[in-house]
Regions:
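Intrinsic disorder/low-complexity segments
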Residues: 173-197
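Long, charged alpha-helical interface segments
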Residues: 124-172
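Feature captures the catalytic cores and cofactor-binding loops of soluble hydro-lyases/lyases
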Residues: 16, 22-134
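Conformational gate/switch positions in structured elements
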Residues: 9, 62, 160-162
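Alpha-helical scaffold segments in soluble metabolic enzymes
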Residues: 14, 29, 33, 91, ...
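A detector of low-complexity, intrinsically disordered, Ser/Thr/Gly/Pro/Ala-rich segments
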Residues: 119, 125, 136, 184-187, ...
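N-terminal, positively charged, Ser/Thr/Ala/Gly-biased leader segments
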Residues: 1-20, 24, 164-172
Length: 197
């Protein structure tokens, strides 16, 4: 597991260039272009289980699914940021991508790495552990708490995304979306703790 570190206001065009919006829709088409303009090494070197640390307002900008779909497809384990743009936050939950809001952990990691606020850094020297049961992030020897994630978010993540979660829920109810065993309604996606426009 490695850490990719970035600064504030990482927008969706930085995560996935807008020029590919109408030509790349499938995960395998999206992956080679992730962070292409911000960090050209990311798509070539990212590995399943890696974590992204970032500053404020991560995922701001235009509303597109490709950034979230791509990050999930390359195996990003989690994103730890100071805050998220509202639309990105909701899209990430729908795809089953784990987002954690913990400014203190981000600051601690930045201090340990003495990093630039705008350039991605790959590190294996600083140990990072995420404990969902305890709602904590450990950076080196320091542990920081983050707001407890609602059970619905964790269930959607464990299922692999909102679509898979809903399908499994309908199968369990035996309704197939039409019977009386369930409402057939898509669960409401929870909001971020400190949403951005």
């Amino acid at each position: 597991m490695r850490i990719w570190a970035y600064g504030d206001d990482i927008n969706t065009d930085m995560l996935f260039p807008g020029k590919y919006t109408y030509t790349c829709a499938k995960p395998d088409e999206i992956k080679p272009h992730l962070l292409e303009d911000l960090d050209p090494e990311f798509a070539k070197a990212v590995q399943p289980g890696d974590i992204i640390f970032a500053g404020k307002n991560f995922g701001c900008g235009s509303s597109r699914e490709q950034p979230v779909v791509g990050l999930k497809a390359v195996g990003i384990e989690a994103i730890v940021a100071k805050s998220y743009a509202r639309i990105f936050y909701r899209a990430a939950i729908n795809q089953g991508l784990l987002l954690i809001e913990c400014p203190e952990a981000v600051d601690a990691y930045a201090r340990d790495m003495t990093q630039s606020s705008s350039i991605g850094i790959v590190s294996q020297s600083v140990t990072v552990q995420i404990n969902l049961k305890e709602s904590s992030v450990t950076v080196g020897t320091q542990t920081f708490k983050f707001p407890t994630l609602p059970p619905e978010i964790l269930a959607i993540r464990d299922a692999g995304g909102l679509l898979e979660y809903t399908r499994a829920k309908l199968r369990r109810s035996g309704s197939r979306g039409q019977g009386s065993g369930g409402s057939g309604q898509t669960p409401r996606t929870p909001e971020p703790q400190n949403p951005r426009p």
